From Swiss-Prot:
Biased composition (Basic and acidic residues): 653-679
Motif ('KIIK' region): 101-104
Protein name: Cysteine--tRNA ligase, cytoplasmic
GO CC list: cytoplasm; cytosol
Listed CDD domains: CysRS_core
Record: residues binding L-cysteine: 56, 96, 373
Domain of life where this protein originates: Eukaryota
Organism: Homo sapiens
C-alpha cells in the first residue's frame, strides 16, 4: 500500500500543454477611396475616433432626389460605421448660404416681387416683356446644351402664348377682371424671363444684405425638414458660411502668406502653378485628367464671377478665387483686401479646418463635386496646413438618374424630396437605396421602387408571422424546446448568413449584398415555418425570435427602422415603456377568438348572414384600424398589426382583382350566349337555303339548293362540289337537331 502511494506521488498528474486554435483573420472594413480609386483598409488616425466632413447643400431652392441620393447614402454609411463597426464618429456638415446662385436668385426674387407689387398696367407689362425677350433670345441662341436649350424654348413659347390674350384685350380696350386675369397669367409665365431682365438692369442697386440672407434661411429650414422626413440623422455640428467669414478671411490670409495665393483688384486667387510646382504638394489629386478643363472651372467659379474683367485678373486660367471683391448688388464683408465675399471652395476648407484640424479621416460629397470643388478644397487646405494629407479617405456617392435619364427641369423629370415622399414612404426610399451600391449610379424609377415595395412587404410578412408564433401561449419552460434537425439546419444557415453579411459590410459597406443575404435568410425561415405548419407542429419560438431580432437590429442600423429617441430612463420605471402592439394585441386576440366561436356556430346553424358580417369585419372594418385577420382552414385566425395605408391598398387591389374576375366571367358568359345564339341561328337555316343567299359566289343551284356553277357561270369542279356537299350534310344534321329540339320544347 505504501509503495503504491509513493508511486502515485512520484507520478503526479499535471495538465497537458494547451495550444490555441489556428482561427482565421478577422475581416477588416475596406472603403472605396476616390484618392486611389481602390478599396482601401479603413484605418482611422486616432483609434476608434473618426472625423468626417460632408459637403452640405447650397440652399436656394427645394431639395431634390439628387440631394437625397447623397444624404441618405452618407446617413447609411455613417450609421454602419457608428452602430455596426462601433467607431466613434464626429460628423460635420456645412450649409452654403453665400454663393453666386444664392445672390442671383435672391436679387431676382426681390426685384420681381417689387415689380409685381407695383401692379404694372397691361400695356407697360407687354412693353417690359418684349424688352426682356430680346436678351433672352440672345441667351437662347448662344445656348449649346440641348436640355437647357429645350427648357428655354419652352419658356419662350409659354410667354408668347400668354402674351397673345393680353395683347388682344389691350387692343379691344377691355378693362376689369378679364384684363387682370391675363396680366396675372403673363406675370407667372414670364417670371423667369422678367427676373433675368430686372436683375440685369436693376441688380446693382440691391444693397441690403438681409435680402441675401432671407432666401437661404428659408430653404435651409426646408432642407432640414426634408432630412428629418427621410430619417437622416442631423450632423453633430453644422457650419454656415455666413457664420465663418472671419475664419475664412484668416484662412485666405495664411494661404497668401505661405506663397500660394495672390491679390488682384481686391480679389484673392489661388496660384495653382506655384502649388503644383512644390515638391510637397500635388494638384488635382482626385481627377488629374480634368485639370485645365475651363468649362468645369468656370462652373466652379459661379455665374457672377466669370466676366472678362474677372478672368483677366488671374495669372493662369486654372487659378480660382479664394476671395471675391464684391461688385454692386452683391453682399460684402470687410477684409484686408477691401469689401468682398468668400469663394466657393474656400468655404469648406476653412470650416472643416477650423473644426477638424490639419487632417480628417473622411470627406464625403457627390460624385459631381470631385473636380473642381474637392480638388480645389484639397489644394487650399494643404497649402494652408503645408501638408499632403488633409483628407485620408474621400468618399463620393454615385449619380442619380430618373428612369434612365439625367434629372433636369428641362426634361420635366425634376423630382423634389417632397414629391417623392408623396408617392413612397421614407423607409421605402431608403430600402431602394440599400438595394444599390452607394458609389454607383442609382436609377430612380417605377421598377426600382416596385422592388423596394416588394422587399418591404416580404420582410413585413415575415415579422408579422413571427409575432403571431410568439403570441402562442407557452409556460416558462416550454419556450425552450428540444431542437431537431430542422432547427439545427436553420440555425447553421442563420450564422452562415451573419458571416456573409459581415463580409459584405466589410467590403465597402455593400448593402446590396446584405439585402440579398437577408432575403435568403427570411426565405429559409419561411420554408421552416411552412414545413412545421404542414405537420401541425409549432415552430421553435426562441430560434425564430433570435433571427427576427437580428434582422430588426440590422434594419435599425441602416435607418430603415426608427430608434426610440427618448432621453434618460423610461417614465414610470422599468418595463413601462408603451408599445401599441403590446397594448392592443390582447384585445384583438380576444376579438379574434370570439369571432371564431361565432363563425363556428353560424356554420353549424347555417346562418349565412352572420358569416357575411364576420367577413365584413375582417375585410372592411378592421383594415381601417390597421388590423389584419388571416383565416386559415382548421387553424386559429392569425392577427397582425399592419400599416393602415398598406392594408387599404391591399383591399383596393383585392377589390380590383375581384372586379376583373367578375368582368371576365360576365364577358365569358356573354360570349358563350352569343356563340349559342349564333349556333341556334345557324341551326334554324334549312340546308336547301344555306347557299341561296351567296349570289356573289354562285350563279346556279340544283333542286336541293346545292351550288352547281360559280358566279361567272362556270360549272364547279368535282372537288368544289364535294366540299359543298359535306357542308350541306353537316347543316342537314344541325337542322334535324333543331327540329327535334323544337318538337321537344327545349328552347323558347
Amino acid at each position: 500500500m505504501a509503495d503504491s502511494s509513493g508511486q502515485q506521488g512520484k507520478g503526479r498528474r499535471v495538465q497537458p500543454q494547451w495550444s490555441p486554435p489556428a482561427g482565421t483573420q478577422p475581416c477588416r472594413l475596406h472603403l472605396y477611396n476616390s484618392l486611389t480609386r481602390n478599396k482601401e483598409v479603413f484605418i482611422p488616425q486616432d483609434g476608434k475616433k473618426v472625423t468626417w466632413y460632408c459637403c452640405g447643400p447650397t440652399v436656394y431652392d427645394a431639395s431634390h432626389m439628387g440631394h437625397a441620393r447623397s444624404y441618405i447614402s452618407f446617413d447609411i454609411l455613417r450609421r454602419v460605421l457608428k452602430d455596426y463597426f462601433k467607431f466613434d464618429v464626429f460628423y460635420c456638415m456645412n450649409i452654403t448660404d453665400i454663393d453666386d446662385k444664392i445672390i442671383k436668385r435672391a436679387r431676382q426674387n426681390h426685384l420681381f416681387e417689387q415689380y409685381r407689387e407695383k401692379r404694372p398696367e397691361a400695356a407697360q407689362l407687354l412693353e417690359d416683356v418684349q424688352a426682356a425677350l430680346k436678351p433672352f433670345s440672345v441667351k437662347l441662341n448662344e445656348t449649346t446644351d440641348p436640355d437647357k436649350k429645350q427648357m428655354l424654348e419652352r419658356i419662350q413659347h409659354a410667354v408668347q402664348l400668354a402674351t397673345e390674350p393680353l395683347e388682344k384685350a389691350v387692343q379691344s380696350r377691355l378693362t376689369g377682371e378679364e384684363v387682370n386675369s391675363c396680366v396675372e397669367v403673363l406675370l407667372e409665365e414670364a417670371k423667369d424671363l422678367l427676373s433675368d431682365w430686372l436683375d440685369s438692369t436693376l441688380g446693382c442697386d440691391v444693397t441690403d444684405n438681409s435680402i441675401f440672407s432671407k432666401l437661404p434661411k428659408f430653404w435651409e429650414g426646408d432642407f432640414h425638414r426634408d432630412m428629418e422626413a427621410l430619417n437622416v440623422l442631423p450632423p453633430d455640428v453644422l457650419t454656415r458660411v455666413s457664420e465663418y467669414v472671419p475664419e475664412i478671411v484668416n484662412f485666405v490670409q495664411k494661404i497668401v502668406d505661405n506663397g500660394y495665393g495672390y491679390v488682384s483688384n481686391g480679389s484673392v486667387y489661388f496660384d495653382t502653378a506655384k502649388f503644383a510646382s512644390s515638391e510637397k504638394h500635388s494638384y488635382g489629386k482626385l481627377v488629374p485628367e480634368a485639370v485645365g478643363d475651363q468649362k468645369a472651372l468656370q462652373e466652379g467659379e459661379g455665374d457672377l464671377s466669370i466676366s472678362a474683367d474677372r478672368l483677366s485678373e488671374k495669372r493662369s486660367p486654372n487659378d480660382f478665387a479664394l476671395w471675391k471683391a464684391s461688385k454692386p448688388g452683391e453682399p460684402s464683408w470687410p477684409c484686408p483686401w477691401g469689401k468682398g465675399r468668400p469663394g466657393w471652395h474656400i468655404e469648406c476648407s476653412a470650416m472643416a479646418g477650423t473644426l477638424l484640424g490639419a487632417s480628417m479621416d473622411i470627406h464625403g460629397g457627390g460624385f459631381d463635386l470631385r473636380f473642381p470643388h474637392h480638388d480645389n478644397e484639397l489644394a487650399q487646405s494643404e497649402a494652408y496646413f503645408e501638408n499632403d494629407c488633409w483628407v485620408r479617405y474621400f468618399l463620393h456617392t454615385g449619380h442619380l438618374t430618373i428612369a434612365g435619364c439625367k434629372m433636369s427641369k428641362s426634361l420635366k423629370n425634376f423630382i423634389t424630396i417632397k414629391d417623392a415622399l408623396k408617392k413612397h414612404s421614407a423607409r421605402q426610399l431608403r430600402l431602394a437605396f440599400l438595394m444599390h451600391s452607394w458609389k454607383d449610379t442609382l436609377d430612380y424609377s417605377s421598377n426600382t421602387m416596385e422592388s423596394a415595395l416588394q422587399y418591404e412587404k416580404f420582410l413585413n410578412e415575415f415579422f408579422l408571422n413571427v409575432k403571431d408564433i410568439l403570441r402562442a401561449p407557452v409556460d416558462i419552460t416550454g419556450q425552450f424546446e428540444k431542437w431537431g434537425e430542422e432547427e439545427a439546419e436553420l440555425n447553421k444557415n442563420f450564422y452562415d448568413k451573419k458571416t456573409a453579411i459581415h463580409k459584405a459590410l466589410c467590403d465597402n459597406v455593400d448593402t446590396r449584398t446584405v439585402m440579398e443575404e437577408m432575403r435568403a435568410l427570411v426565405s429559409q425561415c419561411n420554408l421552416y415555418m411552412a414545413a412545421r405548419k404542414a405537420v401541425r407542429k409549432r415552430p421553435n419560438q426562441a430560434l425564430l425570435e433570435n433571427i427576427a431580432l437580428y434582422l430588426t437590429h440590422m434594419l435599425k442600423i441602416f435607418g430603415a427602422v426608427e430608434e426610440d429617441s427618448s432621453l434618460g430612463f423610461p417614465v414610470g420605471g422599468p418595463g413601462t415603456s408603451l408599445s401599441l402592439e403590446a397594448t392592443v394585441m390582447p384585445y384583438l386576440q380576444v376579438l379574434s377568438e370570439f369571432r371564431e366561436g361565432v363563425r363556428k356556430i353560424a356554420r353549424e346553424q347555417k346562418v349565412p348572414e352572420i358569416l357575411q358580417l364576420s367577413d365584413a369585419l375582417r375585410d372592411n372594418i378592421l383594415p381601417e384600424l390597421g388590423v389584419r385577420f388571416e383565416d386559415h382552414e382548421g387553424l386559429p385566425t392569425v392577427v397582425k398589426l399592419v400599416d393602415r395605408n398598406t392594408l387599404l391598398k391591399e383591399r383596393e387591389e383585392k377589390r380590383r382583382v375581384e372586379e376583373e374576375k367578375r368582368k371576365k366571367k360576365e364577358e365569358a358568359a356573354r360570349r358563350k350566349q352569343e356563340q349559342e345564339a349564333a349556333k341556334l341561328a345557324k341551326m334554324k337555316i334549312p340546308p336547301s337555303e344555306m347557299f341561296l343567299s351567296e349570289t356573289d359566289k354562285y350563279s346556279k343551284f340544283d333542286e336541293n339548293g346545292l351550288p352547281t356553277h360559280d358566279m361567272e357561270g362556270k360549272e364547279l369542279s368535282k372537288g368544289q362540289a364535294k366540299k359543298l356537299k359535306k357542308l350541306f350534310e353537316a347543316q342537314e344534321k344541325l337542322y334535324k337537331e333543331y327540329l327535334q329540339m323544337a318538337q321537344n320544347g327545349s328552347f323558347q
